[in-house]
Amino acid sequence: MSIDPRAVVAEGAKLAPGVQVGAYAIIGPDVEIGEGTVIGPHAVVTGWTRLGARNKVFQFASIGDAPQDKKYAGEPTRVEIGDDNVFREYVTVNRGTAKDKGITRVGDDNLFMASSHVAHDCVVGSHCVFANLATLAGHVEIGDHVILAGFTGVHQFCKIGSHAFIANNTAVTRDVPPYIMAVGHPAEPHSVNATGLSRRGFSTEQVRNIKNAFRTLYRSDLPLEEAVTRLREAAATQPEIVPFVEFIGRSTRSLVR
């Protein structure tokens, strides 16, 4: 363990072996930090916050502070962060609120570029990339392998499915299904994220099936109910379509159209 003498580590904080804390960083009393995590200079980790192993928190990032919600009344809500995440300069991750489940969750192996923001009660999966100034409002759910390009804004309570790609300066106001590239202000479905899927090991046939599902939902002029029925039929023999169908069933803000 290496703690710069100019850092402030409150009594009660639990730091595992191999943790590094830089100059003028502040660690709160209810914080737990896993093995090998690096807290950079001037970073703040506070509140009821748990970071797993090998995370990197760069200078001036703020993890676990109070939610930006007028209804918040000081309840001991939490932030739970997995392993191998990178939080670059000025990233903010706020803890949850009692009006929801009281917790903000971040999975593993995510990259949060400078000045990106994860609001209260959000759930972020694993292997995601948040480019500079990508911003989540409260209660947003993000799947795995999602990319949010720079200046993306996501409205509260929206869901974005795994392997989706959101283009820069896009305003997401509805739910974005898995595999989709969305672009615009407000966001509209553009195409399938075929390049990303290929990089992650999807076969040519699987990508073709997903493209067919996209056409059924967005290019066939079918009523939504009929399109979903056809997708369910396809999912019976094409497992890669199952997440697509399940996501539609969980959508609460309607889908991008």
Language-model features: locations:
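Terminal amphipathic alpha-helical/low-complexity segments used for targeting or macromolecular assembly
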Residues: 1-6, 11-12, 17-18, 54, ...
